[in-house]
Amino acid sequence: MAPTTKGAKGKTSAKGESKNNKVLGSKVSKKNVKRPPPKEVKSKARTEQSQLKKTKKREYSEAELDLPKLNMITPVGVVNPKGKKKGKTFCDDPEAMMTIFAMVNAEKEGQIESKIMKARQLEEIREAKRKEAEARQSEKKNKLENAKESIRQSRKHKGGASSAKSNKAETESPKPKSGGKKKSVAFA
């Protein structure tokens, strides 16, 4: 409801309000509103001088950037001039470069020497194992030869003393004197 005035005290007039409502709620048609004509914006050709000029970007110094120094090969005392082409020479002092080179070479030679030492040790171990195996084989052969000789000697002693008694004893009692298993040796 609309606020009431002092003179009207509770009475409202329908005519006055309807006029006010008409003015407030009236629509403005968009067809009748005049707009200014659109302005044409011409783009400049890329070959124009103003387009060809490159804006110079600001170059920051290393101190301003405050970047951490990572992946650097250069020694502590050497500072590479900025903008210099990267190459194999990184040091003005050849003595410092040679000392670094010598240190790296010594490290690599140490690794190679350790590999050679390991190879020698392994070869010595293999040689010792080979000698042990040969010694075992020769020991077995000697043992076998001794057994052969003892058997031959026992046969000679039995045959030379009394051949008749031994033949008779072998036919009568084929069992060996010891109660255990009979040992048999076959030679190829």
From Swiss-Prot:
GO terms for biological process: intracellular mRNA localization; mRNA transport; ribosomal large subunit biogenesis. Keywords: Coiled coil, mRNA transport, Nucleus, Ribosome biogenesis, Transport. It is found in: Nucleus, Nucleolus. InterPro entries: Loc1. GO terms for cellular component: nucleolus; preribosome, large subunit precursor. Residues 107-159 form a coiled coil. GO terms for molecular function: mRNA binding. Residues 37-47, 127-152 have a biased composition (Basic and acidic residues). Residues 1-13 have a biased composition (Low complexity). It comes from the Eukaryota. Residues 1-68, 127-188 are annotated as: Disordered. Residues 178-188 have a biased composition (Basic residues). Component of the 66S pre-ribosomal particle. PANTHER family: 60S RIBOSOMAL SUBUNIT ASSEMBLY/EXPORT PROTEIN LOC1 (PTHR28028), 60S RIBOSOMAL SUBUNIT ASSEMBLY_EXPORT PROTEIN LOC1 (PTHR28028:SF1). Required for efficient assembly and nuclear export of the 60S ribosomal subunit. Belongs to the LOC1 family. This is 60S ribosomal subunit assembly/export protein loc1. The gene is loc1.
